[in-house]
Regions:
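Glycine-rich phosphate-binding loop plus the immediately following alpha-helix
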Residues: 45, 122-124, 148-192, 196, ...
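Short beta-strand-loop/turn "lid" adjacent to the catalytic site in phosphate-handling enzymes
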Residues: 58-110, 143-156, 187-195, 199, ...
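Alpha-helical phosphate/pyrophosphate-handling elements in metalloenzyme active cores
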Residues: 113-117, 124
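Glycine-rich phosphate-binding/hydrolytic loop that grips phosphoryl groups
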Residues: 122, 168, 237-256
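Adenine-nucleotide phosphate-binding core of ATP-dependent small-molecule kinases
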Residues: 35-42, 178-215, 230, 236-237
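Gly/Thr-rich phosphate-binding beta-strand-loop-beta motif of the actin/hexokinase/Hsp70
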Residues: 8-33, 125-147, 163, 248
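N-terminal glycine/serine-rich phosphate-binding loop of ATP-dependent small-molecule kinases
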Residues: 2-13, 17-97
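Short beta-strand segments
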Residues: 16, 67, 92, 130-136, ...
Length: 256
C-alpha cells in the first residue's frame, strides 16, 4: 500500500549554496524544519535537481531564499524552481536586510553566507566572532548589530586535499584529534600538523581580533570541523549547526 502524500501549505524553502556543498531546507508556516537535503555542488544539473527537489511538488511555497557563493549554481537552481514549480527565489544580497544587520565591510565582496551567519547571531547586546569551517575557514566580526568584516583562511579539507594531491609521498589521511604533537609516521605527522596547526591559527586570529578591536566577544563555531577544533587553549566556543540557514530564516520571518 502506497503512503499517501500530504499537501503542506505556506512553506518556506531556504538554501545555502557553498563551493563544496548545497543545503536546502523546508520549513512550515511556524518556521519548524520539515525536510533537509544536502548534495555536492559539483553534481548540480537539471536531472539531478529533479531527483533531489521532487518533494517540492507536494508543497505550496510561500517564500524561497538562498545564500550563494556560487553564482552559476544559484542561477541553475533559481531557473529550475521557476520553470518547474513557478517559485520565485531571492538571493540574500538582493534583499534589504539593513534592519537586521549593518555592514561596515564592502557589501559587494562579502559572501551572503557570512552575512546570514551574522544575522543569525545578532542580539543587539553582545559582540561575536563567528568561525565557519567550510571550503575556507572564515572569521567574521560582529559588534552589537554591525558586521565589521573578517578573516579568510584556507579551509581544512581543501588544504589537506591539496597537500595529498601535490605531494607524492603524502598518503590519504583522515583528520582527527591527536594528543601528541610529534608524529612517528607520515600520517600521524600530517594529522598533528593540521590539528595543532589549525588550533594555533584559530586561537591566534581570535587573539589578534580582540587586540585590534579592544572588545570582548562571544565565540561561535559552525561548519564541518567545528567539533574537532572546539578545545581551544584560550577560547571556549559555542557550536551552532546550520547557522547560515537560521540567519536566512530570520530574514524570512522579518519579511513575512
Amino acid at each position: 500500500m502506497k503512503k499517501k502524500l500530504v499537501n503542506l501549505t505556506n512553506m518556506y524553502l531556504i538554501g545555502d549554496i557553498g563551493n563544496t556543498e548545497i543545503k536546502i531546507f523546508l520549513f512550515n508556516k511556524n518556521f519548524i524544519k520539515v525536510k533537509k537535503i544536502m548534495f555536492k555542488t559539483k553534481f548540480i544539473s537539471n536531472n539531478y535537481l529533479k531527483k533531489k527537489l521532487n518533494f517540492i511538488k507536494n508543497n505550496k511555497i510561500q517564500s524561497s531564499l538562498f545564500s550563494s557563493v556560487v553564482p552559476y549554481a544559484y542561477k541553475k537552481i533559481k531557473n529550475f524552481l521557476t520553470l518547474r514549480f513557478n517559485i520565485k527565489s531571492n538571493e540574500l544580497k538582493n534583499m534589504n536586510f539593513s534592519k537586521l544587520v549593518k555592514l561596515k565591510a564592502n557589501r559587494l565582496q562579502v559572501g551572503s553566507d557570512r552575512i546570514a551567519n551574522a544575522i543569525s547571531v545578532i542580539d543587539n547586546k553582545n559582540n561575536f566572532i563567528v568561525v565557519d569551517f567550510g571550503t575556507a575557514t572564515t572569521f567574521d566580526v560582529i559588534v552589537k548589530n554591525t558586521y565589521y568584516g573578517g578573516v579568510i583562511a584556507p579551509g581544512v579539507s581543501l588544504s589537506l586535499n591539496t597537500l595529498i594531491e601535490k605531494a607524492s609521498l603524502i598518503p590519504l589521511t583522515n583528520l582527527s584529534k591527536i594528543s601528541k604533537v610529534v608524529g612517528t609516521n607520515t600520517k600521524l605527522a600530517v594529522k598533528s600538523g593540521f590539528y595543532w596547526g589549525y588550533l594555533g591559527l584559530i586561537d591566534n586570529i581570535i587573539f589578534m581580533i580582540k587586540k585590534q578591536t579592544k572588545k570582548p566577544f562571544k565565540l561561535i563555531f559552525t561548519g564541518g570541523f567545528a567539533y574537532m577544533f572546539k578545545n581551544l587553549k584560550k577560547n571556549k566556543p559555542i557550536i551552532k549547526k546550520d547557522l547560515t540557514i537560521h540567519g536566512l530564516l530570520k530574514v524570512i520571518e522579518k519579511n513575512n
